[in-house]
Curated annotation (Swiss-Prot):
Post-translational modification: Binds keratan sulfate chains. May be proteolytically processed to give rise to a number of active peptides.
Record organism: Rattus norvegicus
Acidic residues biased stretches: 104-139, 206-216
GO molecular function per UniProt: adenylate cyclase activator activity; adenylate cyclase regulator activity; alpha-tubulin binding; beta-2 adrenergic receptor binding; corticotropin-releasing hormone receptor 1 binding; D1 dopamine receptor binding; G protein activity; G-protein alpha-subunit binding
Protein name (Swiss-Prot/TrEMBL): Neuroendocrine secretory protein 55
GO CC terms: COPI-coated Golgi to ER transport vesicle; cytoplasm; cytosol; dendrite; endosome; extracellular region; heterotrimeric G-protein complex; membrane
Gene name of this polypeptide: Gnas
InterPro entries: NESP55
Family: Belongs to the NESP55 family.
GO biological process: adenylate cyclase-activating adrenergic receptor signaling pathway; adenylate cyclase-activating dopamine receptor signaling pathway; adenylate cyclase-activating G protein-coupled receptor signaling pathway; adenylate cyclase-activating serotonin receptor signaling pathway; bone development; cartilage development; cellular response to glucagon stimulus; cognition
Pfam families recorded: NESP55 (PF06390)
Signal peptide start-end: 1-46
Region of interest called Disordered, as start-end residue ranges on this chain: 61-256
Keyword line: Cleavage on pair of basic residues, Cytoplasmic vesicle, Glycoprotein, Proteoglycan, Secreted, Signal, Synapse
Note: The GNAS locus is imprinted in a complex manner, giving rise to distinct paternally, maternally and biallelically expressed proteins. The XLas isoforms are paternally derived, the Gnas isoforms are biallelically derived and the Nesp55 isoforms are maternally derived.
Length: 256
């Protein structure tokens, strides 16, 4: 019974509700409500978009004006600075040209390479040994056909003239070696020419060294001083393997 009474009550309530607010009216009311809400939202969106566009236009105009003014000011500052920097640069370029020394043109022979500097002391040692051994071996190999009982009066003037000729030749050799480059300057040894076939050649005075120590020291100092104008290029060293032959042979000694 209770269940039937409850179902009957629910039916009455529905009928009463439908009578008070029919379904057609309810549907129309919901449609109007949705329309009004959507219209309000659209109006709000439109107004917000219009305001955003106005603000963006204002910002663009302000930024354009600011950038133009900043660019004009920067250009006005850069122009005098660039003119001043160009004038300073021209002055700086003119000063080194005035202060630059006149470089002398040196010969290529004056520039020593590493290989030349290494071979020079070896050639000096070889020339010294040959210079020391030659005067000792010469009197032994020279012909000794002249008798020992030759009078001293005949030897005197001949020996004096021979010594004078030797000193003159040594002096000329010194001048030639001073004029020549240090690379080509080699110690020279002389073989004294016998005045006659039967006369023994006299030994050269050992005190007179054809290589003057003062001139050699001056050359070394001149070679050690750096040249500011032209730099010397370092010579490339090749791999000195035991299979490869030596680069240069023994330096020949000039004989006069």
């Amino acid at each position: 019974m209770d269940r039937r009474s409850r179902a009957h009550q629910w039916r009455r309530a529905r009928h009463n509700y439908n009578d008070l607010c029919p379904p057609i009216g309810r549907r129309a009311a919901t449609a109007l409500l949705w329309l009004s809400c959507s219209i309000a939202l659209l109006r709000a969106l439109a107004s917000s978009n219009a305001r955003a566009q106005q603000r963006a236009a204002q910002r663009r105009s302000f930024l354009n004006a600011h950038h133009r003014s900043a660019a004009a000011a920067a250009a006005a500052q850069v122009l005098p600075e660039s003119s001043e920097s160009e004038s300073d640069h021209e002055h700086e370029e003119a000063e080194p040209e005035l202060a630059r020394p006149e470089c002398l043109e040196y010969d290529q022979d004056d520039y020593e390479t590493e290989t030349d500097s290494e071979t020079e002391p070896e050639s000096d040692i070889q020339s010294e040994t040959e210079f020391e051994t030659e005067p000792e071996t010469e009197p032994e190999t020279a012909p000794t056909t002249e008798p020992e009982t030759e009078p001293e009066d005949e030897r005197g003037p001949r020996g004096a003239t021979f010594n004078q000729s030797l000193t003159q030749r040594l002096h000329a050799l010194k001048l030639q070696s001073a004029d020549a480059s240090p690379r080509r300057a080699q110690p020279t040894t002389q073989e004294p020419e016998s005045a006659s076939e039967g006369e023994e050649p006299q030994r050269e005075p050992l005190d007179e060294d054809p290589r003057d120590p003062e001139e050699s020291e001056e050359r070394r100092e001149a070679n050690r001083q750096p040249r500011r104008c032209k730099t010397r290029r370092p010579a490339r060293r090749r791999d000195q393997s035991p299979e490869s032959p030596p680069r240069k042979g023994p330096i020949p000694i000039r004989r006069h």
